[in-house]
Amino acid sequence: MAKQFKPETLCVQAGWTPKKGEPRVLPIYQSTTFKYDTSEQMARLFDLEDSGYFYTRLQNPTNDMVAAKICALEGGTAAMLTSSGQAANFYAVFNIANCGDHVVASSSIYGGTYNLFAVTMKKMGVEFTFVSPDCTEEELAAAFRPNTKAV
């Protein structure tokens, strides 16, 4: 059985297992870009044919370690970092719902998220029904459609 670590230990140790001669703690990578020897190598990264770091806004070792720590703390299988809650909302919904799909959401969500769902994602073909957080089970059930993908 795998050893269960306390949250404090996971915060410090999860996501990084140093090899001989490597630092105990992963350094913070402050670079925006990463070096490759040829433009072909970069092209393969941009085309998602190869994996690796090439632009920090997309991925870097520091972000990967933070995601691994969050994953360990939450007991998950993977985690993804975003630059904002709005981006997290977009990714969460758009990975579940496609053009022609439907989602049920609370009517009392953050205004920017309401706008993202009611306007922007509607333009992308995802329809939303907003229900009161105090709605009954019957009212919630009535909001569902055959193409509802998420609540």
Predicted feature locations:
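Conserved N-terminal alpha-helix of the aminotransferase class I/II PLP-enzyme fold
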Residues: 38-87, 115-119
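Short helix-loop-beta connector
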Residues: 73-77, 97-100, 145-146
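Conserved PLP-anchoring active-site segment centered on the Schiff-base-forming lysine
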Residues: 95-113, 132
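PLP-dependent aminotransferase-class I/II
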Residues: 115-151
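Glycine- and other small-residue-rich loops at beta-strand/loop junctions that grip anionic moieties
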Residues: 55-56, 81-82, 106-107, 129-133
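Short conserved active-site loop signatures built around small residues
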Residues: 1-29
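Hydrophobic alpha-helical segments in the ANL/AMP-binding
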Residues: 91-94, 112-120
